[in-house]
């Protein structure tokens, strides 16, 4: 069993999603958004750090998965996103959580099957995979999708490692 915290970073809205993985079964534990209503960036970063720390304390995750920074058209926005992402990662590492990073395209490919999927498609698939009564908010859905991606990728890595080990031992032909 593992609890995974997914984070969709943003300087104004940071989505989070928490799921539990038992074998191949995924279950929803919680999700939401950290909203920073103050104007100055240092105060927003402080709120993101405090919010992520509080979520970690509440859910006690085993793994922390976060979206990688993509290059936006606006360099200033990309820098702010990188800073928001950085404080979230610091909150995780301060709690000794292992951090895993996934590209947005990889998350969409894993959850929807199309790397260029729309936000509404991600929301629908997250709702379906986690058996939720309604679509989660867009930022929370993205965070849940990041957590789901971590589960799928870590399972695949474990299976490949086991197969390689069995091949090395001569158990598979």
From Swiss-Prot:
BP GO terms, sorted: DNA recombination; DNA repair
Ranges in coiled-coil conformation: none
Active site: 8, 67, 139
Binding site for Mg(2+) 2: 67
The enzyme's E.C. designation: 3.1.21.10
MF (Gene Ontology): crossover junction DNA endonuclease activity; DNA binding; magnesium ion binding
Gene3D superfamilies in the record: Ribonuclease H-like superfamily/Ribonuclease H (3.30.420.10)
Cofactor binding: number and manner: Binds 2 Mg(2+) ion per subunit.
Binding site for Mg(2+) 1: 8, 139
Top EC category: hydrolase
Annotated localization: Cytoplasm
Names of the cofactor(s): Mg(2+)
Keywords, comma-separated and alphabetical: Cytoplasm, DNA damage, DNA recombination, DNA repair, DNA-binding, Endonuclease, Hydrolase, Magnesium, Metal-binding, Nuclease
Catalytic activities: Endonucleolytic cleavage at a junction such as a reciprocal single-stranded crossover between two homologous DNA duplexes (Holliday junction)
GO CC terms: cytoplasm; Holliday junction resolvase complex
UniProt xrefs under CDD domains: RuvC (cd16962)
Record Pfam families: RuvC
HAMAP family for this protein: RuvC (MF_00034)
Family that this chain belongs to: Belongs to the RuvC family.
Role of this protein: The RuvA-RuvB-RuvC complex processes Holliday junction (HJ) DNA during genetic recombination and DNA repair. Endonuclease that resolves HJ intermediates. Cleaves cruciform DNA by making single-stranded nicks across the HJ at symmetrical positions within the homologous arms, yielding a 5'-phosphate and a 3'-hydroxyl group; requires a central core of homology in the junction. The consensus cleavage sequence is 5'-(A/T)TT(C/G)-3'. Cleavage occurs on the 3'-side of the TT dinucleotide at the point of strand exchange.
Subunit composition and interactions: Homodimer which binds Holliday junction (HJ) DNA. The HJ becomes 2-fold symmetrical on binding to RuvC with unstacked arms; it has a different conformation from HJ DNA in complex with RuvA. In the full resolvosome a probable DNA-RuvA(4)-RuvB(12)-RuvC(2) complex forms which resolves the HJ.
Name of the protein described by the UniProt record: Crossover junction endodeoxyribonuclease RuvC
Organism: Klebsiella pneumoniae (strain 342)
Gene that this polypeptide is encoded by: ruvC
